Amino acid sequence: MKARRSLLASAALLLALASAGAPALADELPTFQLTFKADGTFEPQRLEVPAGRFKIELSNESKEPVEFESIPLRKEKVLGPGVKSFVVITISRPGEYPFFDDFHQDVKGTLVVKPKE
């Protein structure tokens, strides 16, 4: 019983330390901006990024909740009105990847992944 508690405490400490370093690592990534505008559009609608690992900072300027979603990238993030957040994406294959606002499905954009230089 004592060994199990010790193991659980060690696992909890390891998890806490691992998650504490995650925001710092995300801050060091190449960063791009994507804004949900009050008029129901994305800005920009085409976001160009280099292949690899990067961060997209999301900002909701509308008065409604929005959701960044990309099925091929397997990413989604819900933002309330006026909220800012981010997603970290790792993709090595250049190409065009659609994304949309799941709450307003006619609002669409494209992530254009360029080859790494």
Residue ranges and their predicted role:
Residues P44-Q45, R74-V78, V87-V88:
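Beta-strand-rich interaction surfaces with strong enrichment in secreted/lumenal proteins
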Residues S10-S19:
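Bacterial N-terminal signal peptides
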Residues D27-Q33, K63, L79-E117:
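Extracellular/periplasmic metallocenter environments
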Residues L58-N60:
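Asparagine-centered strand-capping/turn motif at beta-strand->loop junctions
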Residues E28-A51:
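N-terminal edge beta-strand
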